[in-house]
């Protein structure tokens, strides 16, 4: 099915990132003006831009309360921490569990508490309220599906790195994905989690939950009964299914349709893990279009190339707090 899509926004954005690395001087700026001036300018740009491209990284979900360590980890993974010495949700995803029953018990929780619940803070919904009447598109390396949960138009979203809510077969010949919601719910119940009055799984008061699921619940591919894995870009076997290619082409088309307009590249919570997908391409596209403005909002990590500092807004702070200030 992917051959039906002629434009690959993912490939094009990676190329733009490479171009940025080759062409930039390497001189970095933290932007111009005090924070109050930057906030005022940001509010004006969101209001007046012809198009807005949101580039979202892990910092956005962290701001929304979907943290991978601390209280959330201790609340839902305390037993794994005690038995296996796992320190946080992220590192637990790489732990060599002793068997599949334990591995998939972990992943059921990992997926559920990041994909199938609403975040503690309304950061995504507040972002949508700022953009709902705008000409926008979202590219994100996040895999937690929180944009759609908040009500963003799914036709304006490109999840480049996969989705916690999808499985794929380990058989690389099967190039499609499978919704895992029903499986996740069964696996959570099998571990002893109970639902609260809002229908959300919680740990029972006695904390008696299990770190294994029944063998018959280990997910298998419905097409060839092979083992399954989560649809995440962790190696060259990541499945770019029809939905992925459709979104990639939509992103490409949005950039093409708006490339000579007053376009706002709004980067939220993008760190150093995947700068080639969002940060560097945003820099390059801002350089190429004199009408473009680049925005970087992040906690403790905000900067832009010196070449575009006059058309950049860099705000160091919690994303949710910044959005509240410009509502």
Residue ranges and their predicted role:
Residues 1-327:
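Conserved catalytic alpha/beta core of Sir2/sirtuin-type deacylases, generalized to analogous enzyme cores
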């Amino acid at each position: 099915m992917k051959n039906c899509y002629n434009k690959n926004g993912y490939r094009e954005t990676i190329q733009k990132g490479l171009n940025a690395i080759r062409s930039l001087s390497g001189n970095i700026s933290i932007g111009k003006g005090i924070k109050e001036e930057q906030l005022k300018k940001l509010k004006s740009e969101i209001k007046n831009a012809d198009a807005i491209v949101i580039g979202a990284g892990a910092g956005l979900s962290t701001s929304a309360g979907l943290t991978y360590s601390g209280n959330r980890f201790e609340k839902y993974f305390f037993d794994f921490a005690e038995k296996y010495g796992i320190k946080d949700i992220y590192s637990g995803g790489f732990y060599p569990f002793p068997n599949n029953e334990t591995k998939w018990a972990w992943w059921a929780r990992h997926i559920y508490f990041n994909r199938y619940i609403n975040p503690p803070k309304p950061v995504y919904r507040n972002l949508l309220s700022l953009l709902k009447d705008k000409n926008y598109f979202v590219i994100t390396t996040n895999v937690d599906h929180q944009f759609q949960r908040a009500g963003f138009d799914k036709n304006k979203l490109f999840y480049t790195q996969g989705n916690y809510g999808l499985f794929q077969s380990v058989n690389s010949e099967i190039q499609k994905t499978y919704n895992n919601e029903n499986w996740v719910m069964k696996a959570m119940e099998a571990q002893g989690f109970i639902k609260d009055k809002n229908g959300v799984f919680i740990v029972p008061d006695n904390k008696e939950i299990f770190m294994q699921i029944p063998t018959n619940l280990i997910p298998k591919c419905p097409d060839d009964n092979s083992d399954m894995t989560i649809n995440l870009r962790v190696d060259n076997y990541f499945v770019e299914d029809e939905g992925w290619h459709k979104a990639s082409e939509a992103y490409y088309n949005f950039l093409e349709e708006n490339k000579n307009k007053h376009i706002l590249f709004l980067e939220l919570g993008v760190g150093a893990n995947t700068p080639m997908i969002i940060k560097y391409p945003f820099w390059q596209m801002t350089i190429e279009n004199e009408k473009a403005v680049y925005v970087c909002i992040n906690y403790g990590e905000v900067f832009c190339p010196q070449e575009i500092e006059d058309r950049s807004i860099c705000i160091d702070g919690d994303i949710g707090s910044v959005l509240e200030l410009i509502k």
